[in-house]
């Protein structure tokens, strides 16, 4: 028995009957030999973590566009927080932590530069709405590894797709990633908003703070612990109704006070205009696309490929390409 086989056996011994077992995966789009050391979900997490798309999350906006300060969240720090929350909940419920971690690592790979401003920009240019969860699945299925994709397991792929939107993953681990994403972004966006001077702790509605807590750590702790304890008590995945309602109310509060605040969105129109102009440029000049994108034109069409290229940009790379293409360079006398 090798290391992987021993770990798969231990999953049957220690995990809940409701947990997704690595040995029972529905498999990958292209069959592969098993690894001697890592389970299939561990391999998926490693593939995502070592991908170029994951590294680019470091330079993609979470909420605040181009903030002045080193402590604001990026897509990467958000992703890491989601993964930790998901693992904690899965550990408490004896579910598969490796599956949840892999889906969490991949859930935002398809996000555009400049956050949801970029998503809106591409939606205005494409023939159908741009949805980052669908793009995240496209990244791992088709765009990574120069078009070969990462060949991830079905359960991780559906966890990525179902972290937002109407589709609900069939595994409990995938559903936990969905909840962990919301727990993470609501709470760390409050923290960033306080850092930006948009909010103070006293601004949080009293009835919400009374239930969830009066600090960043208290709120996350309340939500995570309640998710675990209520699920164990009821046998159904979820928080107590009053706690779930308080989280929804906090999210509504954030939309009213932060997500539409001029400080957070002050540069959004500029970001949209920049990406739309880049999109138009590459539609007219496809030969200027990177060479590795060109072979896909015959299969996916110009609009889709240009959208892939722009969605994959980091904030600073989009600014660089815009400056390179549209801003006159300074003459240098030699």
Task: Name each model feature, range by range.
Residues 1-75, 79, 83-89, 96-97, ...:
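Histidine-centered, transition-metal-coordinating active-site segments
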Residues 99-125:
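Aspartate-rich (DDxxD/NDxxD/DxxxD) Mg2+/diphosphate-binding motifs
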């Amino acid at each position: 028995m090798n290391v992987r086989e021993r770990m798969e056996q231990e999953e049957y011994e220690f995990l809940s009957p409701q947990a997704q077992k690595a040995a029972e995966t529905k498999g990958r789009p292209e069959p592969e030999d098993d690894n001697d050391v890592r389970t299939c979900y561990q391999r998926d997490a490693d593939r995502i973590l070592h991908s170029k798309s994951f590294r680019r999350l470091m330079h993609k906006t979470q909420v605040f566009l181009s903030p002045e300060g080193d402590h604001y969240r990026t897509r990467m720090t958000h992703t890491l927080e989601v993964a930790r929350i998901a693992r904690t909940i899965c550990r408490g419920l004896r579910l598969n932590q490796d599956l949840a971690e892999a889906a969490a690592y991949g859930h935002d790979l398809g996000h555009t530069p400049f956050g949801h401003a970029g998503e809106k920009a591409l939606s205005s240019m494409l023939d159908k709405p741009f949805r980052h969860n669908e793009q995240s699945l496209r990244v791992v299925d088709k765009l990574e590894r120069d078009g070969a994709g990462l060949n991830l397991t079905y359960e991780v792929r559906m966890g990525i797709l179902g972290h937002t939107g109407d589709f609900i993953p069939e595994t409990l681990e995938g559903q936990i990633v969905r909840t962990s994403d919301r727990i993470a972004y609501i709470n760390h966006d409050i923290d960033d908003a306080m850092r930006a001077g948009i909010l103070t702790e006293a601004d949080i509605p009293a009835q919400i703070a009374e239930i969830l807590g009066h600090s960043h750590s208290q709120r996350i702790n309340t939500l995570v612990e309640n998710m675990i304890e209520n699920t164990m008590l009821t046998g159904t995945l979820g928080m107590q109704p009053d706690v779930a309602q308080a989280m929804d109310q906090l999210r509504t509060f954030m939309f009213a006070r932060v997500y539409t605040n001029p400080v957070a969105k002050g540069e959004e129109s500029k970001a949209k205009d920049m990406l739309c102009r880049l999109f138009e440029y590459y539609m007219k000049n496809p030969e200027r696309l990177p060479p590795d994108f060109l072979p896909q034109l015959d299969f996916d069409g110009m609009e889709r490929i240009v959208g892939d290229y722009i969605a994959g940009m980091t904030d600073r790379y989009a600014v660089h390409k815009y400056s390179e293409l549209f801003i006159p360079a300074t003459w240098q006398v030699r």
